Amino acid sequence: AYDAVFRHYGVLRVDDMDQMAACLIMFSQATLPKHGNLVCLHDSGGERQLLIDLDNDLSVPLTEISADTETKLSSLLDPGLPAVNPLDAWGAGGTNAPEVMASCFETLLLDQSAAMGAVVHDRGPSSEIYASYIPYLERGKNLSKKPVFLVSNRQGSGESRLAVELTHKGLPVIDGINQFLTGTKKMFEYRDFQKLYKNRSKLKSIKSLSIGKSFDKKIDERDTYD
């Protein structure tokens, strides 16, 4: 019974407090996802595969990038790195690596099938967030106007003032890939429910209008035999 009521009213459900906290942080930023799915930027092939494995259980839709996006990414990536989503864009490193990472994230977000994006990078000692991550987020959000998030596998012991500052600026920092994927799924569910609700309201309006017109119609004696 609860499931039916929750589906009808668009109630979002989570399994624990960590997932709830992640959802609250993600929903608190001003931009909600529109059409499309999730794109992710990584600096580790192993971590990229970890996200894919975890996503198999949660079934969060990942963006299938277009041929045009694939071509643009290939021109940015070091040899041997596949132009796919989720994307491991960290090759040999070097002084140009931050620019490559930022450009790759922009390219992913500008794909027509991308609704939101995540930079999945780990924190440093004492939960430090490296300042070099910030341009990836800022450039991606400013160019695409889509929600973006900085995601780490775990917070660790300690806290980062920068994490709070970025979150308040609309660039939320989320700890835990599972928590982030759950939050992403809930954002997509909320988006889809809003579309369904609008369609349902529109249908009710049409029905009300039709019923109203039928009552406004003058009935003469001949109509009573129809």
Where are these regions (language model features)?
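Short, small-residue-enriched loops and turns at beta-alpha junctions
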Residues: 124-128, 155-157
